[in-house]
Amino acid sequence: DKKEPDMFLLSECKAPEENEKINLGCLVIGSQPLKISWEPKKSSIVEHVFPSEMRNGNYTMVLQVTVLASELNLNHTCTINKPKRKEKPFKFPESWDSQSSKRVTPTLQAKNHSTEATKAITTKKDIEGAMAPSNLTVNILTTSTHPEMSSWLLCEVSGFFPENIHLMWLGVHSKMKSTNFVTANPTAQPGGTFQTWSVLRLPVALSSSLDTYTCVVEHEASKTKLNASKSLAISGCYHLLPESDGPSRRPDGPALA
């Protein structure tokens, strides 16, 4: 029998204002062609399915929806309709309850030559016991063989406490639009710290002529900013998808809540 597809629900790390729109994502990985949808169907919900890609026998598909924050009280559900029906409801991240409505605007700029993670100087901590994120990586997730298809970058960060953290992506000259990426809710890891990840959809397939992309991480509690970059001219890809057996989990870590 074919293994059931893995489903991962994604949301922005920061709680939205009541009048704002927010992006939610559903990442599905399975051994068979997939068909996924989002419920409920409403004219105010903008739905976009990124083209399915296959790598090492696994199909990967991302469904992204943009919804009004005021409508998050609805029963939002990601549903796999093919090959076998399976659904997963969206749940509010616990971290949203503790977040202030005030937002922080990152001031970091992308550096074309940067290919390693760089850490800003950590100043006095506002929260007792706060731990700055220590591990940040950006890797190529998949590479399409067709120009009309998209490629993906995966940014992973871990070792931080408390869990409130902000991730964003930069191109060479400007910040990437939030409609181009989705970020997972932070999950606990051994030692009382947290980890999270973000997937960026690139507008075109990988090419040596394309630019460098930078993942920026802001952890306000520890007054820490990190950034890591990946040049698309670097050859080779990283296989970060889960194996065909075993329990459901995120591409490189424990299951999402």
From Swiss-Prot:
Q: Which residues are glycosylated?
A: N58, N75, N112, N135, N227
SUPFAM superfamilies in alphabetical order = Immunoglobulin
Superkingdom, natural source: Eukaryota
Q: Which N-terminal residues, if any, form the signal peptide?
A: none
Q: List the disulfide bonds.
A: C26-C78
- Region Disordered, annotated ranges: 89-111
Domain Ig-like, first and last residues per copy: 5-105, 133-233
Q: Which UniProt keywords apply?
A: Disulfide bond, Glycoprotein, Immunoglobulin domain, Repeat, Secreted
Whether Disulfide bond counts among this entry's keywords is yes
Q: GO CC terms for this protein?
A: extracellular region
* Annotated Polar residues bias: 96-111
Q: Which PROSITE patterns match?
A: IG_LIKE, IG_MHC
Localisation per UniProt entry: Secreted
Q: In which tissues is it expressed?
A: Cell lines producing IgD contain several mRNA species for Ig delta chains. In plasmacytomas, the secreted form is the major component, and the membrane-bound form is a minor component. In spleen, however, the membrane-bound form is the major component. These two forms differ in their C-terminal segments.
More info? This delta chain lacks the domain corresponding to the CH2 domain of human delta chain.
Q: What is this protein called?
A: Ig delta chain C region secreted form
For this protein's source organism, the top of the classification is: Eukaryota, Metazoa, Chordata, Craniata, Vertebrata
